[in-house]
Amino acid sequence: NGVHTQIELFKIPQRHVLGFYKISYKPALGGRLKYGQGYYDFDEGGLLFASPGQVIGGNEDGAVCSEYTLLIHPDFFLGYPLAKKIKQYGFFSYTANETLHLSEEEKAVIMAIFRNIETELNNRIDDFSQDVIISQIELMLNYANRFYKRQFITRKVVSNDLLQKLEELLDYYFDQEMSSNQGTPSVSYLAENLHVSPSYLSDMLRSLTGRNTQQHIHDKLIEKAKEKLSTTSLSISEVAYALGFEHSQSFSKLFKTKTKLSPQEFRKSFN
């Protein structure tokens, strides 16, 4: 009976601290979804994910929203590769405004898996029950990966807007010399100011540009470093400090890794 004590499929509206992995399908999202400082219209259903330790449930407008929810205790995966692999699915760290919005075809695929799991839970438990359920969960997660990739592409207007705001935020950070006081910008700092989760930001950027958030930060660092090295007389240490590095050696190492030249060699090429 261990399967039933560790995994359950049911409706759950209340707000609570999660002790399980949660996958829930909401038939409707109220038509409008908050995104940053604005709203986007979404009338189709959505799939949400959460991991243990997150506070979930409840609705800001007080309306009761029907959820079809799968809760899985982490112990259910012990002894299976999915116990480790599940931590690699970034969407478990997304926030509610980063819901996976499903087309009718995608919804049919996901709901079929929900029903397969429900059927298995209602059957008599045997030696294969856990194997079958875990394979269905992994199948659902793999489909979710595929569908999120599609969503990043089809909602490119939103994604490109976020990319532009990221570039503006990085420019502002360095142009205002915030780096000399606060250090190099972190992924969490950028995500917080862009009103998205760090995981969603990196996954979205990777889908658009092939590069994650940290790589974008490094690209901007190198761009600003080249400007300072070619247009000012600041020493290498002063350039490193201005860009938020505590030690010039760390700056020089990153610069050479990215450009194949040391800062000194790059500067000499302009003299």
What are these regions (language model features)?
Residues 45, 189-196, 201, 205, ...:
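Append "Primarily bacterial transcriptional regulators
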Residues 134, 156-194, 215-234:
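A short, Lys/Arg-enriched amphipathic alpha-helix from helix-turn-helix/homeodomain DNA-binding modules
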Residues 207-246, 268-271:
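Terminal helix-turn-helix DNA-binding modules in bacterial transcription factors
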Residues 1-40:
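Generic protein-terminus/edge-of-domain signal
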Residues 252-271:
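…primarily DNA-binding HTH/wHTH and HhH modules…
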Residues 61-125:
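A hydrophobic/aromatic-rich effector-binding and dimerization subdomain
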Residues 37-49:
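Short acidic-glycine-tyrosine-enriched beta hairpin
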Residues 108-168:
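An amphipathic alpha-helical interaction segment
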